[in-house]
Amino acid sequence: MEDVLDLGEAPSRRTGVKMGRRARAAQETQQETADVSRNQTGREGPPKPLRQGGWADDSSGPSKSTRRMTDDVEDSRLKQQSLDESDEGEDIPVIPDLEDVQEEDLALQVASPPSVQVNRVMTYRDLDNDLMRHAAFQSLDGDVDLKLLTKVLSPEPEVREENVRWDWDLLFTEVSSELITEWDVGKMEKEDMLKPSPLVS
Protein backbone atom coordinates (compact mmCIF):
# COMPACT_ATOMS: atom_id res chain seq x y z
CA MET A 1 0.00 0.00 0.00
CA GLU A 2 2.86 2.32 0.63
CA ASP A 3 3.85 2.05 -2.99
CA VAL A 4 0.42 3.13 -4.20
CA LEU A 5 0.26 6.22 -1.97
CA ASP A 6 3.57 7.54 -3.22
CA LEU A 7 2.51 10.57 -5.24
CA GLY A 8 5.58 11.08 -7.41
CA GLU A 9 5.88 7.57 -8.74
CA ALA A 10 3.72 5.24 -10.76
CA PRO A 11 2.18 2.27 -9.00
CA SER A 12 4.48 -0.75 -8.90
CA ARG A 13 3.67 -4.05 -10.49
CA ARG A 14 2.24 -6.85 -8.50
CA THR A 15 4.63 -9.64 -7.99
CA GLY A 16 2.12 -12.38 -7.71
CA VAL A 17 2.96 -15.65 -9.41
CA LYS A 18 0.87 -16.37 -12.45
CA MET A 19 1.04 -19.39 -14.60
CA GLY A 20 0.37 -20.02 -18.32
CA ARG A 21 0.64 -18.15 -21.56
CA ARG A 22 -2.26 -15.86 -20.72
CA ALA A 23 -0.36 -14.56 -17.74
CA ARG A 24 2.67 -13.78 -19.94
CA ALA A 25 0.49 -11.93 -22.49
CA ALA A 26 -1.05 -9.78 -19.77
CA GLN A 27 2.42 -8.86 -18.49
CA GLU A 28 3.58 -7.86 -21.98
CA THR A 29 0.56 -5.58 -22.53
CA GLN A 30 1.17 -3.92 -19.16
CA GLN A 31 4.80 -3.30 -20.08
CA GLU A 32 3.82 -1.79 -23.44
CA THR A 33 1.32 0.60 -21.84
CA ALA A 34 3.94 1.66 -19.31
CA ASP A 35 6.49 2.30 -22.10
CA VAL A 36 3.96 4.35 -24.07
CA SER A 37 3.11 6.47 -21.02
CA ARG A 38 6.83 7.11 -20.41
CA ASN A 39 7.33 8.19 -24.06
CA GLN A 40 4.40 10.59 -23.86
CA THR A 41 5.73 12.32 -20.75
CA GLY A 42 9.25 12.57 -22.24
CA ARG A 43 10.52 14.95 -24.89
CA GLU A 44 9.55 12.74 -27.78
CA GLY A 45 6.00 13.16 -28.99
CA PRO A 46 3.83 10.47 -30.43
CA PRO A 47 5.11 8.93 -33.65
CA LYS A 48 4.12 10.91 -36.73
CA PRO A 49 1.57 9.18 -38.91
CA LEU A 50 2.62 8.32 -42.41
CA ARG A 51 1.04 10.61 -44.97
CA GLN A 52 -0.57 8.76 -47.76
CA GLY A 53 -1.41 10.74 -50.87
CA GLY A 54 -4.56 10.50 -52.85
CA TRP A 55 -5.00 9.94 -56.54
CA ALA A 56 -2.95 13.02 -57.46
CA ASP A 57 0.13 11.92 -55.50
CA ASP A 58 1.43 9.24 -57.86
CA SER A 59 5.03 10.36 -57.98
CA SER A 60 7.78 8.33 -56.37
CA GLY A 61 9.99 9.44 -53.47
CA PRO A 62 13.17 10.50 -55.33
CA SER A 63 11.26 12.69 -57.77
CA LYS A 64 9.57 14.44 -54.84
CA SER A 65 12.93 15.29 -53.34
CA THR A 66 14.25 16.61 -56.66
CA ARG A 67 11.07 18.64 -57.06
CA ARG A 68 11.59 20.14 -53.60
CA MET A 69 15.18 20.99 -54.50
CA THR A 70 14.12 22.74 -57.71
CA ASP A 71 11.40 24.61 -55.82
CA ASP A 72 14.00 25.80 -53.30
CA VAL A 73 16.32 26.95 -56.09
CA GLU A 74 13.46 28.80 -57.80
CA ASP A 75 12.45 30.40 -54.51
CA SER A 76 15.99 31.62 -53.91
CA ARG A 77 16.15 33.04 -57.45
CA LEU A 78 12.85 34.84 -56.93
CA LYS A 79 14.00 36.24 -53.60
CA GLN A 80 17.22 37.55 -55.14
CA GLN A 81 15.33 39.19 -57.99
CA SER A 82 12.86 40.82 -55.65
CA LEU A 83 15.72 42.24 -53.56
CA ASP A 84 17.42 43.58 -56.69
CA GLU A 85 14.17 45.12 -57.89
CA SER A 86 13.60 46.88 -54.59
CA ASP A 87 17.06 48.50 -54.95
CA GLU A 88 16.15 49.80 -58.40
CA GLY A 89 13.09 51.71 -57.23
CA GLU A 90 14.24 54.78 -59.15
CA ASP A 91 13.41 53.26 -62.56
CA ILE A 92 9.66 53.75 -62.82
CA PRO A 93 8.18 52.89 -66.22
CA VAL A 94 6.69 55.88 -68.00
CA ILE A 95 3.41 55.57 -69.86
CA PRO A 96 3.53 57.55 -73.12
CA ASP A 97 0.97 60.29 -73.71
CA LEU A 98 -1.82 59.68 -76.15
CA GLU A 99 -0.63 62.58 -78.27
CA ASP A 100 2.79 60.97 -78.67
CA VAL A 101 1.36 57.76 -80.04
CA GLN A 102 0.66 58.12 -83.73
CA GLU A 103 -2.32 56.09 -84.73
CA GLU A 104 -2.70 55.06 -88.32
CA ASP A 105 -6.03 56.13 -89.70
CA LEU A 106 -7.21 53.19 -91.75
CA ALA A 107 -10.04 55.20 -93.27
CA LEU A 108 -7.54 57.32 -95.18
CA GLN A 109 -5.71 54.33 -96.57
CA VAL A 110 -7.21 52.97 -99.75
CA ALA A 111 -6.25 49.61 -101.13
CA SER A 112 -5.15 49.58 -104.73
CA PRO A 113 -7.58 47.79 -107.02
CA PRO A 114 -6.48 44.51 -108.51
CA SER A 115 -5.04 44.78 -111.97
CA VAL A 116 -6.81 42.38 -114.27
CA GLN A 117 -6.57 42.52 -118.03
CA VAL A 118 -10.03 42.88 -119.44
CA ASN A 119 -10.97 42.94 -123.07
CA ARG A 120 -12.07 46.41 -124.02
CA VAL A 121 -15.81 46.69 -124.52
CA MET A 122 -16.71 48.53 -127.66
CA THR A 123 -18.92 51.59 -127.36
CA TYR A 124 -21.94 52.31 -129.54
CA ARG A 125 -19.86 54.78 -131.52
CA ASP A 126 -17.22 52.13 -132.27
CA LEU A 127 -19.84 49.62 -133.29
CA ASP A 128 -21.56 52.18 -135.49
CA ASN A 129 -18.30 53.12 -137.20
CA ASP A 130 -17.40 49.47 -137.76
CA LEU A 131 -20.77 48.74 -139.31
CA MET A 132 -20.45 51.69 -141.67
CA ARG A 133 -16.91 50.85 -142.69
CA HIS A 134 -17.38 47.16 -143.13
CA ALA A 135 -20.67 46.85 -144.93
CA ALA A 136 -19.28 43.76 -146.59
CA PHE A 137 -19.15 41.93 -143.26
CA GLN A 138 -22.88 42.09 -142.65
CA SER A 139 -23.01 38.35 -143.01
CA LEU A 140 -20.50 36.39 -140.95
CA ASP A 141 -19.26 33.00 -142.05
CA GLY A 142 -22.11 32.77 -144.49
CA ASP A 143 -24.38 31.40 -141.73
CA VAL A 144 -25.33 34.50 -139.75
CA ASP A 145 -27.12 37.32 -141.53
CA LEU A 146 -26.87 40.67 -139.69
CA LYS A 147 -29.07 42.64 -142.07
CA LEU A 148 -32.11 42.29 -139.86
CA LEU A 149 -30.13 43.46 -136.85
CA THR A 150 -28.71 46.52 -138.59
CA LYS A 151 -32.18 47.56 -139.70
CA VAL A 152 -33.55 47.52 -136.14
CA LEU A 153 -30.60 49.12 -134.32
CA SER A 154 -31.27 52.59 -132.96
CA PRO A 155 -28.72 55.38 -133.25
CA GLU A 156 -26.72 56.30 -130.14
CA PRO A 157 -28.41 59.66 -129.35
CA GLU A 158 -31.78 57.93 -129.09
CA VAL A 159 -30.51 55.26 -126.75
CA ARG A 160 -28.23 57.32 -124.53
CA GLU A 161 -29.77 58.80 -121.39
CA GLU A 162 -28.43 61.80 -119.56
CA ASN A 163 -27.10 61.37 -116.06
CA VAL A 164 -29.71 62.89 -113.80
CA ARG A 165 -28.97 63.45 -110.16
CA TRP A 166 -31.61 61.91 -107.93
CA ASP A 167 -33.16 63.87 -105.12
CA TRP A 168 -34.66 61.68 -102.42
CA ASP A 169 -37.64 63.93 -101.68
CA LEU A 170 -38.46 64.44 -105.35
CA LEU A 171 -38.12 60.73 -106.12
CA PHE A 172 -40.32 59.80 -103.14
CA THR A 173 -43.11 62.18 -104.16
CA GLU A 174 -43.02 60.96 -107.78
CA VAL A 175 -43.24 57.30 -106.79
CA SER A 176 -45.96 57.90 -104.20
CA SER A 177 -48.08 59.91 -106.66
CA GLU A 178 -47.73 57.15 -109.27
CA LEU A 179 -48.85 54.55 -106.72
CA ILE A 180 -51.82 56.65 -105.59
CA THR A 181 -53.03 57.08 -109.16
CA GLU A 182 -52.71 53.33 -109.79
CA TRP A 183 -54.70 52.55 -106.63
CA ASP A 184 -57.39 55.04 -107.58
CA VAL A 185 -57.72 53.49 -111.03
CA GLY A 186 -57.92 50.03 -109.46
CA LYS A 187 -60.67 51.14 -107.07
CA MET A 188 -62.67 52.67 -109.91
CA GLU A 189 -62.46 49.44 -111.91
CA LYS A 190 -63.60 47.36 -108.91
CA GLU A 191 -66.53 49.69 -108.26
CA ASP A 192 -67.55 49.49 -111.90
CA MET A 193 -67.51 45.70 -111.76
CA LEU A 194 -69.53 45.61 -108.54
CA LYS A 195 -72.26 47.91 -109.84
CA PRO A 196 -75.29 45.99 -111.04
CA SER A 197 -75.68 46.26 -114.75
CA PRO A 198 -79.10 47.51 -115.94
CA LEU A 199 -81.25 44.80 -117.38
CA VAL A 200 -82.07 45.21 -120.96
CA SER A 201 -85.71 44.49 -121.63
From Swiss-Prot:
It holds the Pfam family IFT43. Signal peptide: none annotated. It comes from the Eukaryota. Keywords: Cell projection, Cilium biogenesis/degradation, Cytoplasm, Cytoskeleton. One of its GO terms (biological process) is intraciliary retrograde transport. Belongs to the IFT43 family. Component of the IFT complex A (IFT-A) complex. It is found in: Cytoplasm, Cytoskeleton; Cell projection, Cilium. It comes from Xenopus laevis (African clawed frog). Residues 84-104 have a biased composition (Acidic residues). One of its GO terms (cellular component) is cilium. Residues 68-78 have a biased composition (Basic and acidic residues). This is Intraflagellar transport protein 43 homolog. InterPro entries: IFT43. As a component of IFT complex A (IFT-A), a complex required for retrograde ciliary transport and entry into cilia of G protein-coupled receptors (GPCRs), it is involved in ciliogenesis. Involved in retrograde ciliary transport along microtubules from the ciliary tip to the base. Residues 15-24 have a biased composition (Basic residues). Residues 1-104 are annotated as: Disordered. The gene is ift43.
